[in-house]
Amino acid sequence: MARSTARPVVKLKSTAGTGVTYVTRKNRLNDPDRLVLRKYDPVAGEHVPFREER
């Protein structure tokens, strides 16, 4: 069975400018805009917003 195109893999990049990335899936139907999640950045040592890369 093929993977769904409605839930693509997206890269989340730290807004702190450290170059740290997370990889996750998102539902395009529910979240058509860029995804922003607050996650831990080990280089910065704190929780920062991670924004979806295009």
Swiss-Prot record:
It holds the Pfam family Ribosomal_L33. One of its GO terms (cellular component) is cytosolic large ribosomal subunit. One of its GO terms (biological process) is translation. InterPro entries: Ribosomal_bL33, Ribosomal_bL33_CS, Ribosomal_bL33_sf, Ribosomal_zn-bd. Keywords: Ribonucleoprotein, Ribosomal protein. PROSITE patterns: RIBOSOMAL_L33 (PS00582). SUPFAM superfamilies: Zn-binding ribosomal proteins. The keyword Ribosomal protein applies. It comes from the Bacteria. One of its GO terms (molecular function) is structural constituent of ribosome. Belongs to the bacterial ribosomal protein bL33 family. This is Large ribosomal subunit protein bL33C. It comes from Streptomyces coelicolor (strain ATCC BAA-471 / A3(2) / M145).
